[in-house]
Amino acid sequence: MIIIPDCSVRSRPHSRTVLVTVAATALAAGCLLAALCLGQPSVGPAAALAAVTDPEHPLRVAVVEVRLPRALLGLVAGAGLGVAGLLLQDALRNPIAGPELLGVSSGATVVVAAIVVLGLGVPLALQPWLALGGALLAGALVLLAIGRTRDPAHVVLVGAAMSAACGGLVVAVVGLGTQGNVVVLFRYLLGSLAARGWPHLETVAPIVGAGLAGAWLLRRRIEALTLGDEVAAGLGVPVVRTRVAAVGLAALLAAAVAAACGPIAFVALLAPHLARRATGTTSTRRVLPLVAVAGGLLLVAADLAARRLLYPVEMPVGIATTLVGVPALLLLRRRRQPRPAVTG
């Protein structure tokens, strides 16, 4: 067994992590209930719960067939994105690593765009696995270009280059499609939970569940990587295999979400940072459950805000997360820049 010492920056009681996780879970449940209540028509919490439990309830179609799968998909997709961000940040020892910044999400998007625009008729259940191929290819190219450097600025530049290249491929694919397919693709590229039903949830949930289980099994080895490659190797951790497995799991999670919801940025970046700040620990194994809950909470809350901000017009959730995520990324980058020395 690999014994990993607690690598928290600050020593805090484990009970704080449990307490914060329980509180975040309660907030996520509240957002789920709010998602069932809001819409046209709006209903109260009691009526929403009655519609879920009563097959004959007049609002059952609106609540159970439209709102419930959308909200549950938000929780599942957010959890997958959050854990994908945690895996990449800890395995690469880079606090601003994420599927959207390493080109992983863009690689998956290219594959799904080709399926949509070219009308290939690929079954929904198969699309995440094809998207995984694009995600793994893009991620592998970025990792090869990064090499051994851990400089966040260099990683962001390489990831931005890969995202730009994938964006160019999407534009090229658009030129081959019909007007109707291009409209569908445009809506997909904005990132949204709208018009998603039980088939989308049934496709994504098992894949995300498998990815979360894999992350849980690797949590101690990934935490060892945060101590440095030499220390991790000294603890008996196969460094290269663990890092490859972590990136592969992150690509799997990001590809599944991208196939069902489109590219949704910055949930993967923010969820791990919020979890670490709330608990006061950087321990991978301690914050992993909280990161999953925080990711789901962020995405469902963002979707609620997107639905109500410009009501009755609905903003795609991908735009809402970007509006919050870009300033957060700039803030994180600014905090990491060393202050100039004072002389004289």
Report each predicted region and the residues it spans.
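Alpha-helical transmembrane segments in inner-membrane proteins
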Residues: 1-344
